[in-house]
Amino acid sequence: MTNIRKTHPLIKIVNHSFIDLPTPSNISAWWNFGSLLGFCLIIQIITGLFLAMHYTSDTVTAFSSVTHICRDVNYGWLIRYMHANGASMFFICLFLHVGRGLYYGSYIYFETWNIGVILLFAVMATAFMGYVLPWGQMSFWGATVITNLLSAIPYIGTTLVEWIWGGFSVDKATLTRFFAFHFVLPFIIAALAMIHLLFLHETGSNNPSGLISDSDKIPFHPYFSIKDLLGVLILLLIFMNLVLFTPDLLGDPDNYTPANPLNTPPHIKPEWYFLFAYAILRSIPNKLGGVLALVFSILILMLFPILHLSKQRSMMFRPLSQCFFWILVADLFTLTWIGGQPVEHPFIIIGQTASILYFTIILVILPFISLLENKLLKW
């Protein structure tokens, strides 16, 4: 009798994706982040579902409903902090996952890569709308500032902003629709993640060397399922340490003050994972220019397959490219730091320099270095 695992229409799909999947034998721990992202998404959906049972999306009661969750609901404080810090863990895994893709040339599978960039946008949109829901000071003013950026779009901008707000300012209508979208988007993200995997399994995984690995593949289970499990345990250890010991480490104290449209916080800033893009936005004195730079700072990822001019796929054997890759990483850390600082000297000029460097490395330096390396290897 043939194995049900290989014949059953549903189990067969799971088998081809997670059990009998031929996997390159040399993939390192950098390949763990896909499964960790799936794990983060599951945590976010489960904790979010339980939070939605007690949350009310009304401007009058939203803040107090979050307080009620933390004080009166059984383990409500745990669910709330797991959800808030789960977003941070999600973005840490996302940035490492994208960084791995850039370093090892995974963007050559451009369907998988482009779906991944769309996923990144969807996760960023979800996180932004989720940040508005507790209806604290930073929630309200963050929503006001970020949605207002759309007014920079010529001709339709102002109408578009008022349409998104559902009125002439961020109010009850805005909060209700943000809650609705925040609830539905994670399920769309889950569907997109399945498409992401579908495209990946069409080509098979990349590996650190960037070479074709068809002659050296091993089954995903038990080798990489155990490896992924270890990754999940390490993530859980870091995550629960964060949740149980320093739950407010990555949050903003201003969000413990109820939203007040008459009182602007001294420094309006988004969550830490958006600070790099926020710094790029602020470094351009023109509103429309800033918005375009903000969008392009993420959209630029879609250009990587076109900008890849090296004869080698991975950066593993390209020390010059490696050097500039790590300068790019350092530049992103600098932008993240600048995004959290007030708009004053010397932070303005540092932010502008870091923003120029970010686009220059990606659009000019890395392609040029790739050609130089080809030349050095007489290719």
Curated annotation (Swiss-Prot):
Binding site for heme b b566: H97, H196
Residues that span the membrane, as ranges: 33-53, 77-98, 113-133, 178-198, 226-246, 288-308, 320-340, 347-367
SUPFAM superfamilies: a domain/subunit of cytochrome bc1 complex (Ubiquinol-cytochrome c reductase), Transmembrane di-heme cytochromes
GO molecular function ontology, one term from the record: metal ion binding
Binding residues for a ubiquinone: H201
Any Gene Ontology biological process: mitochondrial electron transport, ubiquinol to cytochrome c
Family designation: Belongs to the cytochrome b family.
Record's protein name: Cytochrome b
Naturally occurring in which organism (per UniProt): Hylopetes nigripes (Palawan flying squirrel)
Gene of this entry: MT-CYB
